[in-house]
Amino acid sequence: LTATDKQLLRLFMEGLDTITYWYRSGRFIPGILPMPAQHLASNSFIDALSDLLLNCRLPVGLVNLGVHKLQDADSMDSCVEGLLRMRRLGVLIHLLDFSGTSAQINWIKQMEPEGIHIEIGQFRAEGLPNEMISLGQKFHTEIYASNITLVKDLENAMSIGAHHCYGELMMPPISRHQILHTSDSRIAKAIFSLHPHKNLNGDK
């Protein structure tokens, strides 16, 4: 394993620790752990990932592997075997940074990932490729559209058939005042501890 491999494994382990923390706190919160496609072509790297997954003893469905930098046929073909090994361990597969190329769509047909993540702003200038229209109806997968800041972005997300939409148009920023009024909020309590005030705003 190279130094980069070891660094990625350390970050992956930290991600597993975070998921485990929430799971033991009684919250079933899945986590998507990003991983460059080229690293998934290494058998020794997949062996190391498998050891980490088997040792964490998390239930199936909590660990999601986010594959990114999947840009050419070589990276797509070389990572398939490793991803199949991950799937046999109960890991769900997500494709990050989807751009709608024919090669990526063929890869989706082959792998059938559980999630596809699309940065919708990339289609503002030239519009959606024909292959992207009604994408949600073509595959049994969840589609996540991000960076929705314009009405055009939302229209494109609807044309794709996205199941989840994120961005400034969908989620305006939450002010500190609103956060302080959120009941049972760790963030609110952290802010309150830094800036004490006579009014507890519901946080006790």
Which ranges hold each PLM region?
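Catalytic core of bacterial c-di-GMP phosphodiesterases, primarily the EAL and HD-GYP domains
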Residues: 5-78
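A short alpha-helix capping/helix-coil boundary motif
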Residues: 28-29, 60-63, 85, 111-112, ...
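Alpha-helical scaffolding segments of alpha/beta enzyme cores, especially the outer helices
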Residues: 17, 47-51, 78-88, 106, ...
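Glycine-centered small-residue hotspots that permit tight backbone geometry or close packing
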Residues: 4, 8, 87, 99-100
